[in-house]
């Protein structure tokens, strides 16, 4: 196992040195399991990985905290020869498993969305200040290291304004030009192409996920408007200080992450003027999901069900809510 953020491994930050070191230490006649973390720090790492892939006695695992690992040349070299395993913070079910079997589920859910779904937070969750320090450090690492440094962004304050906008609008349809116009009207003038570049950097760093829109009747992707979701809703309190508000969109964020864990392509559905929160496509199969904090109100129930009822197919359709009525 080699972690390339460890100074002890600095001599191997060159693909030839890395390949020679690994090959020299392989056990002949046995399967060798190799784990490389943040290997993109190695100059020319693609060549080392490609050569190691050619060895019959090597099972290779490469981990990274952003999408740059599988971009460009490495994706071309390894096409069809790798399996991508996406990792997420804890699901609510996994979070519950850390608690006593008789824990109150509603209280656990409030804690889950207010504190964090990152595993380490479970060890420090009773110390609110330590949780905040941990999440702040995590956020700064992602934004400053993965985004600012890699994209060579000079206006960090503008980038953070975009981050705050996205965090404040999770679950809302966002159009690049509208984001630009809104921020400009608030005194932060920014061009549409800059907003687009910043959002691309943020989604590549996995702090946000983008979900494109899909015409459920015409069965085609729409070119404008996407929704954005945070990798962890607990980060909202670090980004913009919100606590306890907008619970409907927070629930939608939680559902999105759960669907992403289960695999498939995820879209925001559109049918006429109505919206379907999520359309999940897995091969030939589809499923449709509406998410609402509560549907005890008759008008709300009708509003949530009508788009599902208007879809002209027989794939499964679900309405997810926090209501616990029998």
Annotate each predicted stretch with a short phrase.
Residues 35, 59-65, 86:
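Structural recognition of the conserved hydrophobic beta-strand(s) that form the central parallel beta-sheet
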């Amino acid at each position: 196992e080699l972690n390339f953020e460890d100074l002890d491994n600095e001599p191997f930050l060159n693909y030839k040195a890395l390949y020679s070191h690994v090959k020299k230490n392989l056990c002949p006649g046995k399967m060798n399991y190799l784990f490389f973390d943040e290997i993109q720090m190695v100059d020319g790492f693609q060549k080392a990985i490609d050569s190691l892939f050619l060895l019959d006695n090597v099972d290779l695992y490469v981990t990274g905290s952003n999408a740059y690992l599988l971009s460009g040349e490495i994706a071309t070299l390894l096409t069809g020869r790798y399996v991508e395993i996406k990792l997420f913070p804890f699901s609510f079910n996994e979070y519950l498993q850390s608690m006593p079997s008789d824990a109150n589920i509603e209280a656990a859910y409030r804690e889950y969305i207010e504190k964090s779904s990152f595993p380490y937070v479970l060890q420090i969750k009773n110390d609110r200040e330590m949780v905040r320090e941990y999440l702040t450090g995590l956020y700064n690492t992602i934004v400053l290291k993965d985004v600012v440094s890699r994209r060579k962004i000079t206006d960090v304050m503008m980038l953070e304004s975009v981050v705050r906008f996205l965090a404040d609008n999770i679950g809302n349809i966002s159009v690049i030009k509208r984001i630009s116009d809104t921020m400009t009207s608030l005194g932060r003038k920014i061009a549409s192409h800059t907003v687009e570049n910043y959002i691309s950097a943020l989604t590549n760093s996995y702090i946000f996920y983008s979900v494109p829109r899909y015409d459920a009747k015409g069965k085609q992707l729409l070119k404008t408007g996407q929704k954005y979701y945070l990798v962890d809703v607990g980060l909202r309190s670090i980004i913009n200080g919100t606590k306890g508000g907008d619970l409907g969109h927070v629930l939608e964020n939680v559902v999105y992450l759960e669907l992403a864990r289960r695999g498939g392509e995820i879209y925001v559905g559109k049918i006429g003027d109505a919206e379907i929160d999520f359309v999940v496509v897995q091969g030939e199969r589809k499923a449709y999901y509406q998410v609402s904090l509560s549907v005890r109100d008759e008008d709300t129930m009708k509003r949530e069900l009508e788009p599902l009822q208007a879809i002209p197919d027989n794939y499964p359709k679900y309405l997810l809510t926090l209501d616990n009525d029998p």
